[in-house]
């Protein structure tokens, strides 16, 4: 083994020895190959670098994600690119050509310069990590301080146009800044701080101002509804009291019965309000738990449940008003007609009160909107003042970093010394900034607590004063002098009290805002003084000791650093002014949206009113039997309920608008930040390179895209929430329909009872019964004479029925002919309509943009035709019903005349005197006819040959309907025995006492 190994080694060494003659050509060839290989590698590396830069530029131009928002220095970008190129050179070719996903993200993060808001809680760094801002505690800040000197210094709030990035794909979002696509689920689950008053927003940090202010807006709307509902209850009690004094003038205001009714109504209203407040409190606490945050989904669910409960409360108040009429009939023993008149008067005055409340609600909604816009403006102003210290810190640290960098370049300061000094300055400055935020929060909370205590005390005093003012007004006013003027005066008193409370709250909001601004200014001046001490200590004490520089040179360097910081702060101040201008424009745009939604809500209310009014008029037009008074009372009650329901829906529409704005707050914030970034990029430099112009155009395109998305999202959100409003409107309409069905049913029942009891007076029924008894026992009446009278009566009734049928058929044929002629005329006018011909002519052009308009016009035309056709059918049926009623009334009059003739002839035959003749009352309004009281003497042959009524007459009598059957049901039938005596079928003549009375009457006659 050893020999073999030695042999191989010796052989190898001999092979490695070069011949002297070939040494020079080999060296030359090696040099040429090495030079060629070096040139090839250099070209390869430069080609790869250019390719990577081109790919990065394409990715920047094609990026469609939300831009991140932080400022990076130009020098730091160059350093980052150099580090990236050094890393790229160390990698082999396949890895460079196909970098991994993490490598792409890291390279992109190193090359992108992004803009972050000054109040963001976490700022991503170039390596993907994040360091907290001054909102974090001191330990977290100290943990990252050693790494701060290695981060790029931020010289100014301006940057180049390499600021489009793909940040925003992260899920992390704070309450003040959300950075991702806002899907519905994510928006609804977004949690924000639960606030009970406006000062709490000013004292809290990292608060979403838009959502918190809108939540306060919802709370103010609920307070408006509560105040107006309480005023409605107060006015109802006063109106009821005035109506009692008007309809019962003998009753005094302090009468026991009146006080009993009023106290019962007041107690019922108090119980109704207590139950509502308990349900509202349960709904307010639903799903909240002990957390100080609330989600948008919880807010929408709470508002929906509140609306349902308020609608139920409205229905309960309607039922309470209905209970007044039976109470009057029971307690005051008044007639039903007087009770109906009382309710009509009460309803009319409540309609006036509802009109006053509706106008007041519109004014309060506008006032609440102005207050909300003002609160948003004040909160943004305090936020700007509070975050100004961060800009000061960043700009001063950036200027200090440049000054130390200058000393390092000059060789007067080593790199290690520069890093140590910069670390010390970062730590000192950020600790002072943290102290500023901590002290501002603590002292701000103290101011808020003092403000809330002061406001609660002032509100209690104001409530007591206003209560005494109301009592004094009610004691001095006269209810019965002029009810309309009294309602207006009482409403003005309550309206003035509400405005006073609102002004008091607004003044307190302004006062606490001024106090917070003064506190911020005080702390700002203190912090700036501390910063100046840090700078003086660094340049006048530390640097002369470390670098052995003269104090004069250090003073000059300090002045240069301060001038650099002043220039950067000036740029930051200009940017903040533009940012504030954009914010004011956004607030004005939001206000216009609110006003437009209010206008649409007014149009919706008008449409609902027209629909319900046309419906109730159509229903009442089908009931021709109702009296004018009943119809007027029904329409009056419907108007009152409709006004109340529409007022509730109007306030709910305002709530829907607020919820829609809360849903869109995230996208509006994103668009606002894009506008701010565009303003920042445009203010960097008037001279831009080609790729910078491309990036600027890409940013503008991104803004247009986000604006289009925001508009689409606003439309979709508005449609979804409007569907909820329409569903609640349908629920309120259903409640109104049930109430009106009950009222109309009661009116129809009263009408049916009146019709059934028409003409059936007690005196007339008693006379018929007495006449039958007398005829049965009379010796003057024979079967032959009775049969003759009955036969003549049946013949007369048969003629009347035959004439009635002929008239009925004739009228129906006439009405049918009139309807056919009217339909032909309507169709002829429809086909000759010039508007239809013009639409057809326009449609022949085939313009695609007019297809939708033609379809809409065709749909509208068909709906109009259907409406006209239905109205024509309704008019025809109404005319037919009127004709039938007229013929029926005429038949009833004739049958009653025939019945009166039979009674008079029978009483004459039985020697029974008729009661005093009263003019026959025709309740259908037909012409009256005199009643015959004398009997015509039949011919002698009829006296001799009298027979029973034939079968035709009996059949005719059996088939008589309506008034005829009721007429004969009142008088029992009479039959004849073989002995010639008459008997009563009901055997009433068997009663001895009755018989004796009848005989006594006969003897007296």
From Swiss-Prot:
<feature type="region of interest" description="Disordered">
    <location>
        <begin position="914"/>
        <end position="1005"/>
    </location>
</feature>
<dbReference type="GO" id="GO:0098797">
    <property type="term" value="C:plasma membrane protein complex"/>
</dbReference>
<keyword id="KW-0969">Cilium</keyword>
<dbReference type="GO" id="GO:0036064">
    <property type="term" value="C:ciliary basal body"/>
</dbReference>
<protein>
    <recommendedName>
        <fullName>EvC complex member EVC</fullName>
    </recommendedName>
</protein>
<keyword id="KW-1003">Cell membrane</keyword>
<comment type="subunit">
    <text>Component of the EvC complex composed of EFCAB7, IQCE, EVC2 and EVC; built from two subcomplexes, EVC2:EVC and EFCAB7:IQCE. Interacts with EVC2. Interacts with EFCAB7. Interacts with IQCE.</text>
</comment>
<feature type="compositionally biased region" description="Polar residues">
    <location>
        <begin position="835"/>
        <end position="853"/>
    </location>
</feature>
<dbReference type="GO" id="GO:0045880">
    <property type="term" value="P:positive regulation of smoothened signaling pathway"/>
</dbReference>
<feature type="topological domain" description="Cytoplasmic">
    <location>
        <begin position="43"/>
        <end position="1005"/>
    </location>
</feature>
<feature type="compositionally biased region" description="Basic and acidic residues">
    <location>
        <begin position="939"/>
        <end position="956"/>
    </location>
</feature>
<keyword id="KW-0206">Cytoskeleton</keyword>
<comment type="function">
    <text>Component of the EvC complex that positively regulates ciliary Hedgehog (Hh) signaling. Involved in endochondral growth and skeletal development.</text>
</comment>
<feature type="transmembrane region" description="Helical">
    <location>
        <begin position="22"/>
        <end position="42"/>
    </location>
</feature>
<keyword id="KW-0966">Cell projection</keyword>
<dbReference type="GO" id="GO:0005737">
    <property type="term" value="C:cytoplasm"/>
</dbReference>
<dbReference type="GO" id="GO:0007224">
    <property type="term" value="P:smoothened signaling pathway"/>
</dbReference>
<dbReference type="GO" id="GO:0051216">
    <property type="term" value="P:cartilage development"/>
</dbReference>
<feature type="region of interest" description="Disordered">
    <location>
        <begin position="150"/>
        <end position="180"/>
    </location>
</feature>
<feature type="topological domain" description="Extracellular">
    <location>
        <begin position="1"/>
        <end position="21"/>
    </location>
</feature>
<feature type="region of interest" description="Disordered">
    <location>
        <begin position="834"/>
        <end position="853"/>
    </location>
</feature>
<dbReference type="InterPro" id="IPR026501">
    <property type="entry name" value="Limbin/EVC"/>
</dbReference>
<keyword id="KW-1133">Transmembrane helix</keyword>
<feature type="region of interest" description="Disordered">
    <location>
        <begin position="58"/>
        <end position="98"/>
    </location>
</feature>
<dbReference type="GO" id="GO:0005929">
    <property type="term" value="C:cilium"/>
</dbReference>
<keyword id="KW-0963">Cytoplasm</keyword>
<feature type="compositionally biased region" description="Polar residues">
    <location>
        <begin position="993"/>
        <end position="1005"/>
    </location>
</feature>
<dbReference type="GO" id="GO:0060170">
    <property type="term" value="C:ciliary membrane"/>
</dbReference>
<dbReference type="GO" id="GO:0003416">
    <property type="term" value="P:endochondral bone growth"/>
</dbReference>
<keyword id="KW-0812">Transmembrane</keyword>
<feature type="compositionally biased region" description="Polar residues">
    <location>
        <begin position="157"/>
        <end position="166"/>
    </location>
</feature>
<keyword id="KW-0472">Membrane</keyword>
